[in-house]
């Protein structure tokens, strides 16, 4: 079932694969594989790979990955290697830029051209960014995310970088009307689910210093106070905002922090190649009271022989994590 090739100028050479792991992380480019191949068996030698080679992985005849070998661990009879798709070049390279009156897609095309990264379809993002100044050396990936974040704040449209057949692309973030279903007793073999109030707040207090005065805004969860007692979250705000905006932020913080926090992770299941980070999946775990759609945050697919399993972590909302550009 595993088909693994090293692509040369004039031919594809098939590798003797023992196992392949394919993984990805939402908002953490790129996707990657770790593979173990047989290079020698008795007097018989087989094709191998070197750093910089392009490898292609297929499962049941469908291409799931194409990327560049970055690391190898040779052994007497086998070789383990890691390969990354084209988004690796956005992470590995840094630069400083000044963009004026450019759309995010135009910024991507400029960066790809400067760093000789081949491209496929790049969606027109519509919104013109008046100015984007990158004064310090910053990864190309973070520069692009800054442009995409500004675009989303102005248009509400969400875009995704991807790698396809060795080329960098940009598309509207997929939100399919039909999603895969994972269910205990059907295709889920294990999971970790926990609930906690360790990070819960029943009262929020924000403070801001200005002109030797302290401005304060607070919000409380009356139901939570009665049930869990006082669990106060405090924050000093440095942004230049007025009292109404300070109160609004306090209300937002309370909405984020009130109630019991639920965490669903390490979901182990029968492998489905299409279940990848950044895509929605419907999860049914009746014994935990879970029947809803989540977004895949991380995915790791394991292939060996004819067996395919996967482990995923999920999030409830497909929002940019704090700290992302």
From Swiss-Prot:
Pfam families per UniProt: YQBQ
Q: Which family does it belong to?
A: To B.subtilis YqbQ.
List the PANTHER family: PHAGE-LIKE ELEMENT PBSX PROTEIN XKDQ, POTASSIUM BINDING PROTEIN KBP
| The protein's name | Phage-like element PBSX protein XkdQ
